[in-house]
Amino acid sequence: NISNVTALDILGDVEALSEERIDTVVNMFLKDFKEDLIETKGWPNYVTAYKISKTCLNAYTRILAKRFAQFRVNSVCPGFVKSDFNCNIGIFTVEEGAKHAVTIALLPEDGPSGCFYERAQLSAF
């Protein structure tokens, strides 16, 4: 969850969204991070870089969906999956997490594209 107004405006403008605009948000974040302005500028204050990277990945999903309209391009958060990354303290098994990604990958040809799913549920960016 990002409350940085400029970042929200840039990433929320779907029609004008571009790789350059995503880079602008990343560079704004990096500048604020280096200057210790994360909280002041409205960036997440917990697992900050991770959340920004996922937000930008979701924005990039929209770009790819538009660029490659003949394909279904979506992003999926599988949930808090047990993995080496989190010292295996996740809630879901790898199989449970993968199940939802496979479900989204197998959407019909006329299914949604440019969307974000939390597990198998359509979610807002």
Please tell me what each predicted stretch does.
Residues K66-Q70, L107-D110:
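Short amphipathic alpha-helical interaction elements and helix-loop-helix interfaces
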Residues T55, S75-S83, C87-F125:
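C-terminal helical subdomain
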Residues N1-A69, C77-P78, N88:
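Catalytic loop of short-chain dehydrogenase/reductase
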